[in-house]
């Protein structure tokens, strides 16, 4: 499997800050933040599957524009995989005809551009030899993470999450774990806000990584554009030997 980072920032501002989206091989998106807009029409047309972690706008906004751009160019609908609460939020708050058209009935209900597939924690979706497993996350709205397993190695993406014991009990059983992408949305000066928002800050990240019992290359995502240097400095000063690195746009993982 090949994962290319299209966006990994907590927000926008500057040429390199795109919100969360990862392109897996040519046909899968993990979340659909603003980074999707950097793909060409030809690349967009190849995407058949979108796996959504949760309903917050920085993770779903480009689904709307993506469908508008390429829906008519594709022979079949795009499948959005999400939990029941997330699908409900997308239907109520985005594809509701007030904010954006409902592409599950466009151009016709029989041949739409969009279809939903409901998933839950523990679901395993097999796509041409690739396995995507839904992982638990703890956030202010119902949320999940994902394990991507090529058969040779696995990459875990936590999605947006606060402290999450349930995640580590699953991750520590992944024998072929190679990469871990984990969020750290706040610096330690905003620890109380991180706790309230169910995100992580560096000191909380350290507590979470202490629960990891398997070796993995660790990358930090969802950094706020105004606090990248401060937050990474705090992470670099954490005790231990894990040495997480900041995720970057266009970073490619092969596994």
Model-predicted regions and their roles:
Residues 36-82, 177-178:
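Active-site metal-binding motif and surrounding structural segment of the metallo-beta-lactamase
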Residues 30-33, 48-58, 81-83, 156-161, ...:
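Active-site neighborhood of phospho(di)ester-bond hydrolases with catalytic His/Asp-centered motifs
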């Amino acid at each position: 499997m090949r994962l290319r980072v299209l966006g990994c920032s907590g927000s926008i501002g500057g040429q390199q800050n795109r919100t969360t989206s990862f392109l897996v091989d040519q046909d899968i998106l993990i979340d659909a933040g603003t980074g999707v807009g950097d793909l060409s029409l030809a690349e967009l047309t190849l995407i058949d599957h979108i796996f959504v972690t949760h309903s917050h706008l920085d993770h779903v906004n480009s689904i709307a524009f993506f469908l508008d751009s390429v829906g008519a160019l594709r022979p079949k609908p795009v499948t959005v995989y999400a939990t029941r609460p997330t699908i409900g939020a997308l239907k109520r708050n985005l594809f509701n005809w007030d904010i954006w058209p409902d592409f599950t009935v466009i151009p016709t209900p029989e041949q739409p551009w969009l279809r939903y597939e409901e998933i839950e924690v523990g679901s395993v979706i097999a796509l041409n030899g690739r396995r995507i497993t839904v992982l638990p996350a703890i956030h202010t709205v119902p949320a999940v993470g994902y394990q991507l397993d090529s058969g040779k190695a696995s990459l875990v993406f936590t999605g947006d999450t606060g402290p999450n014991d349930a995640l580590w009990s699953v991750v520590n059983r992944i024998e072929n774990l190679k990469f871990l992408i984990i969020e750290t949305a706040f610096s330690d000066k905003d620890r109380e806000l991180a706790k309230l928002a169910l995100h992580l800050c560096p000191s909380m990240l350290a507590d979470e990584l202490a629960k990891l019992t398997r070796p993995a290359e660790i990358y930090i995502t969802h950094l706020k554009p105004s606090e990248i240097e401060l937050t990474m400095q705090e992470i670099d000063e954490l005790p231990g030997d894990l040495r997480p690195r900041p995720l970057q746009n266009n970073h490619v993982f092969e596994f």
